[in-house]
């Protein structure tokens, strides 16, 4: 009986902590994006606009986004912490950074290098969950190589930039985090999700066949899907 009470207390404690951190992350995501240095949201050599330089400007509205983000983080954190609290710390940090990157790409068509660097740093927290650090390094190189190859094919085939340098660097960072199998899954899932969304928007005549969409939101959804639900699944039958 005492053992069950202790176990129940541990579970309750994990849930409470996950809820508190989720609320902080949801509110913090909105606050940080609104206070992010304007230079982070510009291309190299570009002068930030008055909107980006104005500290009172709400780049995204506090309501309803802080509530929606908080709910999302609470749900995901509970799932993560019930699986492995140590993994949950690293994964939750990655999800927060991916949200900031998605907002930046969606609103300003930019992938801040500073956030990508932070993402690379979080890869340190995943070292215990890989058989070898080499898997992380190779994952990063594979992610970088795949996106670079697609960028080159797009440039030569369509005579225009199909994938930005920020997307390539982001895949390198995610490869460091998820390893070889993880980055291959994220790559495939990104392609499927983005293609499905583009086809839907095309059918509704919201985009043209020649249009391009921000990739980071799709990459982030694919990465979140893998990290939250599929990390511990063995994909050896596929790879």
State each model region's role.
Residues 2-239:
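A membrane-topology feature that recognizes alpha-helical transmembrane segments
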């Amino acid at each position: 009986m005492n053992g069950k009470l202790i176990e129940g207390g541990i579970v309750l404690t994990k849930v409470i902590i996950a809820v508190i951190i989720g609320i902080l992350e949801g509110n913090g995501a909105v606050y940080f994006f609104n206070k992010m240095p304007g230079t982070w949201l510009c291309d190299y050599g570009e002068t930030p606009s008055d909107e980006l330089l104005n500290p009172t400007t709400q780049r995204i509205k506090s309501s309803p986004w802080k509530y929606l983000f908080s709910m999302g983080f609470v749900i995901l954190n509970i799932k993560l912490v019930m699986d492995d609290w140590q993994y949950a710390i690293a994964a939750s940090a990655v999800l927060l950074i991916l949200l900031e990157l998605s907002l930046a790409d969606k609103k300003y068509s930019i992938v801040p290098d500073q956030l990508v660097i932070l993402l690379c740093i979080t890869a340190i927290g995943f070292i215990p969950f890989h058989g070898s650090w080499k898997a992380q390094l190779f994952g990063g190189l594979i992610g970088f190589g795949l996106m670079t190859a697609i960028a080159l094919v797009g440039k030569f085939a369509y005579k225009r930039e199909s994938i930005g340098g920020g997307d390539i660097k982001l895949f390198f960072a995610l490869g460091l985090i998820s390893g070889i199998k993880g980055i291959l899954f994220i790559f495939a899932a990104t392609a499927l999700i983005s293609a499905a969304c583009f086809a839907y928007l095309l059918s509704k005549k919201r985009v043209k066949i020649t249009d391009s969409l921000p990739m980071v939101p799709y990459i982030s959804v694919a990465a979140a899907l893998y990290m939250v639900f599929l990390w511990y699944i063995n994909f050896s039958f596929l790879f």
